[in-house]
Structure formats: C-alpha cells, structure tokens
C-alpha cells in the first residue's frame, strides 16, 4: 500500500450495518471535508489524464458531481451531470439500469455530449457496477468515446470493475476495500 492510499483510507469513515445489516458503508464525506485528502484524491484521479484530450467529465449523481466537477476543472473540460430520471429540465435521453434489488432509470441532456467527445466517467465508489454500467451505456449510446471511468473506491468482490471492462472501458480506482 502506498502512502497516498494510506492517507485516503484514513480519511474515509466506515459505518457498519448501514444502510442495512451486513453492509459496511464507506463514507467519503470525511475525505471531502479534509482539504489535503480531497486535493490528493482529485490529483490522483486527474494525473493519468493530464495532457490527454478530454472534452467532458460525466459525474453520476450525487457524489460523482462533487468529484467530477473538480476533475473537469483540473482538465479544463466541460461537465455532464448524469441524474436520476425526472431531475433535468430540458430534452433528455434515458436508460434503465439494474440495481441490487430492481431497476431504475438515469438520464442526461440530449445535447450534453457530441459524437466523438472524449469523456471521463466519475463516481465515488464502484460496487456491483450497475449504475456505472448504465451511465457508460448511456454515454456510448450518445456517441461518446469513454476515456476512462474513475472512482476513489473499488469493492472488488462485487464485480463492478469487470462490468465496465466488458464494455471496453478503462477503469481507474485509488483504493480497495474488502466486502460490501
């Protein structure tokens, strides 16, 4: 484990049995509230793409907005909010995606991405990968070229990374936690 990984892990609060028994919730609000750790996380996520053409950063609601906005700023790229259905005011494109216990829908503005735009997809954590997979499919459906999907946390036992890689998406994560 690197010093950066140790720093990030120590900045994340772990809450047992939330939102239900048997789940260990990884709360990044403590990382976001720590200026040094927040900057370190953003710098580590951005570093591999400095000097790479990135047109847009797409953030998945809600923590992906915080991280994605900061990453877009660092890369001088635009930002695309990917939201739950019914939350965007203009003409949207929507996709259904699988959750652990059902199906939901997410959307983005139809004019948010142009065919061929180089896009980085961002969220705080990848677990089962259903939400990230849906967002990646939505972006690809609109013609985006996904440069990478970036997350602070990976829960590798839940297989989300593999879902994105099966779509041809390069996945970057900073730290891993065991379990759920």
From Swiss-Prot:
The UniProt record lists the keyword Kinase: no
One MF annotation (Gene Ontology) recorded for this entry: AMP binding
Database matches in InterPro entries: Ade_phspho_trans, PRibTrfase_dom, PRTase-like, UPRTase/APRTase
Gene Ontology biological process terms from the UniProt entry: adenine salvage; AMP salvage; purine ribonucleoside salvage
Localization, UniProt: Cytoplasm
GO cellular component: cytoplasm
Superkingdom, natural source: Bacteria
Metabolic or biological pathway: Purine metabolism; AMP biosynthesis via salvage pathway; AMP from adenine: step 1/1
EC number: 2.4.2.7
Job of this protein: Catalyzes a salvage reaction resulting in the formation of AMP, that is energically less costly than de novo synthesis.
Assembly description: Homodimer.
PANTHER family: ADENINE PHOSPHORIBOSYLTRANSFERASE (PTHR32315:SF3)
Protein name as it appears in the record: Adenine phosphoribosyltransferase
GN (gene name): apt
């Amino acid at each position: 484990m690197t010093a950066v990984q140790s720093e990030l892990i120590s900045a994340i609060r772990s809450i047992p049995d939330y939102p239900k028994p048997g789940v260990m919730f990884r709360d990044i609000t403590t990382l976001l509230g720590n200026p040094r750790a927040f900057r370190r996380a953003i710098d580590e996520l951005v570093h591999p793409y400095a000097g790479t053409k990135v047109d847009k950063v797409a953030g998945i609601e809600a923590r992906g907005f915080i991280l994605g906005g900061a990453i877009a700023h660092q890369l001088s790229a635009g930002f695309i909010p990917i939201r739950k259905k019914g939350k965007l005011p203009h003409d949207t494109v929507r996709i259904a995606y699988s959750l652990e216990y059902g199906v939901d829908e997410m959307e983005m503005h139809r004019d948010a991405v142009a065919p061929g735009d180089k896009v980085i997809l961002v969220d705080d954590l990848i677990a089962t990968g259903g939400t990230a997979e849906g967002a990646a499919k939505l972006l690809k459906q609109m013609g985006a070229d996904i440069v990478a999907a970036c997350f602070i946390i990976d829960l590798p036992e839940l297989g989300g990374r593999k879902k994105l890689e099966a779509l041809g998406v390069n996945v970057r994560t900073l730290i891993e936690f065991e379990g759920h």
